[in-house]
């Protein structure tokens, strides 16, 4: 960023929630807020920026163990190239959703296998990468239960739709894959 003439501040996350907190506290002070990390770090940053009311742009340098979201929107897997794209002002427009009071632009999900991303220790992610999530998912198979859910889309609009069912897994998604495992039809996303 410095090579491109950008004045930068660097904050290092040490625990879950830090990216959300930092983005919420400081987004109004910057033209661009960017993170280097995985899909979870990016999701936290989005929630923090949107909940702060800031109008800044956001950037994502995919540097985590899966980087599913970055891949699905065509970001470079090379962190230097991804950083250059941000510094050069390259942008794409993305939708942001709200799910139970939290903002997201990748996926909000519930049910089977969704706890894996939170329960895998960081050191195992560092050692095994994406495989750590798969192994946790296999471990979680024995505890899968359905949940009764009610989903309201376009609430208050003429196109409002209510879906109420018992589901094992559900997701609201803005990408062509979930967790690097479930691939979706790009025309339906």
Predicted regions and their residues:
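ATP/NTP phosphate-donor binding region
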Residues: 1-33, 43
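Catalytic core of DAGKc-family lipid kinases
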Residues: 4, 11-13, 51-172
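Phosphate- and divalent-cation-binding pockets in alpha/beta enzyme and binding domains
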Residues: 18-21, 44-45, 68-69, 115
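Short, solvent-exposed amphipathic alpha-helical segments in soluble enzyme
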Residues: 25, 50-51, 121-122, 186-188
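Active-site acidic Asp-centered loop
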Residues: 36-37
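Short Gly/Thr/Asp-enriched flexible loops that form oxyanion-binding sites at enzyme active sites
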Residues: 41-53
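Short amphipathic alpha-helical segments
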Residues: 46-49, 71-73, 183-184
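Internal anion-binding site segments
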Residues: 166-189
